[in-house]
Regions:
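A cross-family phosphate/adenosyl-ligand binding-site feature
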Residues: 2-108, 148-186, 191-213
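Active-site/ligand-binding-proximal alpha/beta "capping" segment
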Residues: 101-135, 142, 193-202
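Short acidic/polar capping segments at secondary-structure boundaries
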Residues: 118-120, 134, 147-149, 180-181
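Short loop/turn segments at connectors of secondary-structure elements within structured domains
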Residues: 11, 135-137
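Short beta->alpha connector loops at strand-helix junctions that form conserved
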Residues: 51, 75, 95-97, 115-117, ...
Length: 213
C-alpha cells in the first residue's frame, strides 16, 4: 500500500545568507553573523551560502556547523582555485560561473537573509529582489540591518519609489529586520503579495530558478 503525500518526509527549510567575504570594521557584524548561524542550526533550518571560508561567510558557516546544522556552500571553480573555499561543510557544490552560483543558491533556498557585505552581496540582493518583482520567484528577501549598515540602501529604495522607478508595492519586497530572530521569522514567512512587473497580476509566480530574465 502506498503512503499518502501527508506521510512523506517534508523538505527541510533552508535559508540563503548573503554576506561579505570580509568581516567589516564593526565587531557587531561578526557577532551577528555567528548568532545567525547558530540560530539557524538550533531551529533546524539549513544554511545555504556562497561557500567561502573567509569573512562573514566563514563566520556564519562555522557557527552553524558547530551548532550541528546543515550547511551547503555553492562556489565557483575560480574561487576554489583561489583557495577560499570552505572544506568543512555538509556539502560543497562547485559551479562554473557567478550566474550559476546565484541560480543554484536560489534553487536551494526557501528565503534570503542579507547581511552586511560589498558589491557581490548587493548584486545578489538586487537580483533576487528583481526576480521577485518580475514574478519569476516567490521567496522572501530580508535585509538584516546591523549598526544601520543598510540604511543608505533603504533610503535609496524609498527615493526610487518617490521618483517613480519602483512601485510602492514592489518596495515591500525588500524587508528590513533589526535582529536575528526577526530576520529568520521574516525569511521563513510567505513573500509579500505584490503585483508582478510586466506580467499578468493573476499569473502564478515560479517557485524555482527562472529560465530567463
Amino acid at each position: 500500500m502506498c503512503q499518502s503525500d501527508e506521510m512523506s518526509e517534508p523538505t527541510p527549510t533552508r535559508l540563503c545568507v548573503y554576506c561579505g567575504s570580509n568581516s567589516g570594521t564593526s565587531p557587531a557584524f561578526a557577532a551577528v553573523a555567528a548568532r545567525l548561524g547558530t540560530a539557524l542550526a538550533n531551529r533546524g533550518i539549513g544554511l545555504v551560502f556562497g561557500g567561502g571560508r573567509v569573512g562573514l561567510m566563514g563566520i556564519t558557516a562555522d557557527a552553524a556547523m558547530q551548532a550541528g546544522g546543515e550547511v551547503i556552500g555553492v562556489i565557483t571553480e575560480r574561487l576554489v582555485g583561489a583557495e577560499v573555499a570552505h572544506r568543512e561543510l555538509t556539502r560543497l557544490e562547485v559551479v562554473a560561473t557567478m550566474h550559476d552560483r546565484k541560480a543554484r543558491l536560489s534553487e536551494l533556498a526557501d528565503g534570503f537573509v542579507v547581511m552586511p557585505g560589498g558589491f557581490g552581496t548587493v548584486d545578489e540582493f538586487a537580483e533576487m529582489l528583481t526576480w521577485n518583482q518580475l514574478g519569476l520567484l516567490a521567496k522572501p528577501v530580508v535585509l538584516l540591518d546591523v549598526d544601520g549598515f543598510w540604511e543608505p540602501m533603504l533610503t535609496w529604495m524609498d527615493k526610487a519609489v518617490e521618483f517613480g522607478f519602483v512601485r510602492p508595492a514592489h518596495r515591500m519586497l525588500a524587508q528590513r529586520a533589526l535582529s536575528v530572530d526577526e530576520a529568520i521569522a521574516m525569511a521563513t514567512s510567505p513573500v509579500p503579495d505584490t503585483p508582478h512587473k510586466w506580467l499578468d497580476r493573476d499569473a502564478t509566480p515560479a517557485r524555482g530558478v527562472p529560465e530567463q530574465l
